[in-house]
Amino acid sequence: MKDLSEKYALQKQLPAYIKLEENATIFGVWDDHDFGENDAGGSFSKKKESRKLLFDFLDIPKNHPAQEREGAYQSYCFGGGTQKVCLYLLDVRYFKEDYEKNSSPNQRYKKNNGLLLGADQWSWLEKELSTNDATINLFAGGIQLLSAEHPYEKWANFPLAQKRFFDILTKYSIQTPIYLSGDRHIAEVSYQEIKSNYWIYDITSSGLTHSYESLEDEPNQYRISPLLTMLNFGKIEINWEIFELQVQILDADGIPQFTQKISIQ
């Protein structure tokens, strides 16, 4: 944990991050390398210590509800009426069941019938969504929700958990669901109609410091954007006048490389 603590401290000292803190409200949740080990999950022995470091780095108040439970999942809502937005930060690390290695070169891990999010986080999420009245709902988690054909970490490694997430969205008719993911060192936008006239987007952006520039192609039946391998970040803008979202993937110079417009449901 000493190395991780030092990296958090270094990040806080970077002029660009200081400028970001001065000009924006920062919300965050971890992925594996913030958590402590590559592809790590619930069996990681230092997860409680790592959680404290994360919350200290994010300046999460001591009286925040997330401080009272295991894991790092959080929720925030903004605005009201027809202009309400909710953000759900999902923890895909703290409770994740361990993978079983797969001998196939096409899939690194065997499919797992585990919960991925853990029982408590699932209960929290369903309770949150049962009273949700937001017009836009953003869900963020480290691993990709939709892309299923690549060999790395993804929700598709946990098919029952993925189905459960889709079922909860449709059960409560959650409006304009958009999932935000990273992890892959690439950027892409995926889209899936999970039932008739009900869809979800998965916006993947990663990363600002490392990217998989040598990757030429990768199967993803749900991809609706180019496969982008340069350093990148994502941006979402909301136009309430025409009830439309604009999602962009930008390169390290801030130049848009892909734009997707999404009608607010």
PLM regions with names:
Residues 1-265:
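Metal-dependent phosphoester/phosphodiester hydrolase catalytic core
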